[in-house]
Swiss-Prot record:
Its EC number is 2.7.7.6. The keyword Nucleotidyltransferase applies. Coiled coil: none annotated. Pfam families: RNA_pol_Rpb5_C. Its main location: cytoplasm. This is DNA-directed RNA polymerase subunit Rpo5.
Length: 78
């Protein structure tokens, strides 16, 4: 069973490398300042992300509508 097929799991997608500079500028941060997501996370594995990728997580909520989060994929040794 794919983890992402469960209705409670938010959508995960890899941000293309050429879009990362715009994202960093928009939020006024450095790439190392993103919250971290381990390479061993089941959804990181499922979407095929690699260390250094930025993953966009879109969560749906009855109260908040939709919220977007970004995470930096890091190795397990962090």
């Amino acid at each position: 069973m794919k983890v992402s097929s469960h209705e409670m799991v938010p959508e995960h997608e890899i941000i293309p490398g050429d879009e990362i500079p715009f994202l960093l500028e928009k939020y006024g941060i450095k790439i190392q300042q993103f919250p971290k997501l381990l390479i061993s996370d089941p959804l990181v594995i499922e979407v095929g992300a690699k260390v250094g990728d930025i993953v966009k997580i879109t969560r749906k909520s009855q109260t908040a509508g939709e919220t977007v989060y970004f995470r930096l994929v890091v190795s397990n040794s962090v």
